[in-house]
Amino acid sequence: MQIWRQLAATGVALLLLGYYPLAQAAPAAKLWDRWNAFNPASSATIDHRPWHNWLETFVVSGADGINRVAYNQITEADRARLRTYIDSLTALSISDFKRNQQRAYWINLYNALTIDIVLEHFPLNSIRDISRGLFSSGPWRLKLATIEGEALTLDDIE
């Protein structure tokens, strides 16, 4: 009977540990008051054409209908273009824009940073292979960008 209890306890522990990476990959959304600032009167727009052009070059549709980034075709010059786009976004004072501009900004910044971190570690089988340590899976908690003086992770942006 003792052996069955130990096996059951071990099974439960392994099951719970198996969910740990999933909990990290999908954190609970929490909005920071810091990012509630916006300018409803702003007529300024953010130029995402460099990102659009970059994606048009490197995103391919698979036979299964899923779009994928052709990481193996990206050169150092192409990555430099991506970094230039990211740098142009991080240089902006995002609080000065309307909400719709902010939304596009955060979505595009998140995606560009994600591709950039994959390129930094390429080749790899999964983004989860990018790790900060034993109990981390993926780059979501790495400080990847500084916006208005605030160092942010992909989790923060999400």
Locate each region found by the language model:
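Bacterial N-terminal signal peptides that target proteins for export
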Residues: M1-G11
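Bacterial N-terminal signal peptides
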Residues: T10-Y19
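Sec/Tat signal peptide C-region and signal peptidase I cleavage site
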Residues: P21-A25
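Interaction/scaffold regions that mediate signaling and macromolecular assembly across diverse proteins
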Residues: A26-E158
